[in-house]
């Protein structure tokens, strides 16, 4: 009873804190609050509090249930939210390199944890006895590696999708460009002396516009490079986790079902996902290929991860159906 109450408290604390953090992030986009009262640093500390809250939640559920909390969809979602918190912690303590990971990790963590605690999963939040197939030491190794891999790959893929949005976003003419265009049209109505005077002002405006455009394009280029830098490294880490998870799952399957690979729906989609991200990493090894191409592949991988993660749970078929929506 005590553990159940503690779990309930930690769930609400972590969700409340991360909700406040996300609100602060949105406010800093609208108003420059970080220079006024240092809200941005406070939001980072909020994610740290959330990390420890989710960690306490997982440990409490572990002690309460008597097994590692990865036996159903609810527990795996909480663990996935914890994985996003870990990624944010890495960016928080790596302050030498400014990055925008928090813009991805915070909304992702609150969305996943919000879905897990929304009541849509029926009785899954209640701890239950493990089915015989899950009563193995391989549970911790296999499922934790897969979820960590999903978290890292999702985060890296979202960064790649942000790269595509920034790259293909059409930037409209600036106020200076519009102003210059109007002034050039007005010069046709005046004499030569006035024309010379106005064009001298236009030259100053044009120089200001060039400097502004150069500065804007420079920071845009820097942001694209930073997104590509972090997406590659996070996806590489996620690919390692996914590989270890698939291999450990194959060994576990051989011990349980007598075969390393059964082409179960989840196994098939995991293999497809692994192949897509292997293609991504192969593309990144070629420096002559633009980062846009690899970002497109990562975006495809983002969709495949959700199919692999939720597909079997929605259908409730195959050897991995014990964590589905239909099983209670």
Curated annotation (Swiss-Prot):
The entry's keywords: Chloroplast, Cytochrome c-type biogenesis, Membrane, Plastid, Thylakoid, Transmembrane, Transmembrane helix
MF-aspect GO terms: heme binding
UniProt subcellular location: Plastid, Chloroplast thylakoid membrane
GO cellular component annotations of the record: chloroplast thylakoid membrane; plasma membrane
Topology versus the membrane: Multi-pass membrane protein
Major site of localization recorded for this protein: plastid
Domain of life: Eukaryota
Transmembrane spans: 13-33, 46-66, 73-93, 101-121, 146-166, 234-254, 263-283, 295-315
InterPro entries: Cyt_c_assembly, Cyt_c_biogenesis_CcsA, Cyt_c_biogenesis_CcsA/CcmC
Matching Pfam families: Cytochrom_C_asm (PF01578)
Any one Gene Ontology BP term: cytochrome complex assembly
Function, in words: Required during biogenesis of c-type cytochromes (cytochrome c6 and cytochrome f) at the step of heme attachment.
Family under the similarity heading: Belongs to the CcmF/CycK/Ccl1/NrfE/CcsA family.
Subunit structure: May interact with Ccs1.
Name listed for the protein in its UniProt record: Cytochrome c biogenesis protein CcsA
């Amino acid at each position: 009873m005590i553990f159940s109450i503690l779990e309930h408290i930690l769930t609400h604390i972590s969700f409340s804190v991360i909700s406040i953090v996300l609100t602060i992030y949105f406010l800093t986009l609208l108003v420059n609050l970080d220079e006024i009262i240092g809200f941005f640093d406070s939001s980072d500390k909020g994610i740290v509090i959330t990390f420890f809250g989710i960690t306490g939640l997982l440990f409490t559920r572990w002690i309460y249930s008597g097994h590692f909390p990865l036996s159903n969809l609810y527990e795996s979602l909480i663990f996935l939210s914890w994985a996003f918190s870990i990624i944010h912690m890495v960016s928080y303590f790596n302050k030498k390199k400014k990055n925008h990971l928090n813009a991805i990790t915070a909304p992702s963590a609150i969305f996943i944890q919000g879905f897990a605690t929304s009541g849509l999963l029926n009785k899954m939040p209640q701890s239950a006895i493990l089915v015989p197939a899950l009563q193995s030491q391989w549970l911790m190794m296999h499922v934790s590696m897969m979820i960590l891999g999903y978290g890292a790959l999702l985060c890296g893929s979202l960064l790649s999708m942000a790269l595509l949005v920034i790259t293909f976003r059409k930037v409209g003419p600036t106020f200076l460009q519009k102003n210059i265009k109007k002034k050039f049209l007005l010069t046709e109505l005046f004499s030569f002396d006035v024309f010379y005077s106005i064009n001298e002002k236009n030259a100053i405006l044009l120089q200001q516009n060039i400097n502004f455009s150069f500065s804007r394009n420079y920071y845009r280029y820097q942001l694209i490079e930073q997104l590509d830098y972090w997406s590659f490294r996070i996806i590489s880490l996620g690919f390692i986790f996914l590989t270890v998870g698939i291999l450990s799952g194959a060994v576990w399957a051989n011990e349980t079902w007598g075969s390393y690979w059964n082409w179960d729906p989840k196994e098939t989609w995991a293999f497809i996902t692994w192949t897509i991200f292997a293609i991504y990493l192969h593309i990144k090894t070629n420096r002559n290929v633009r980062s846009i191409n690899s970002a497109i592949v990562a975006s495809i991988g983002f969709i495949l991860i959700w199919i692999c993660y939720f597909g079997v749970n929605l259908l409730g078929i195959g050897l991995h159906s014990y964590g589905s929506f239909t099983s209670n």
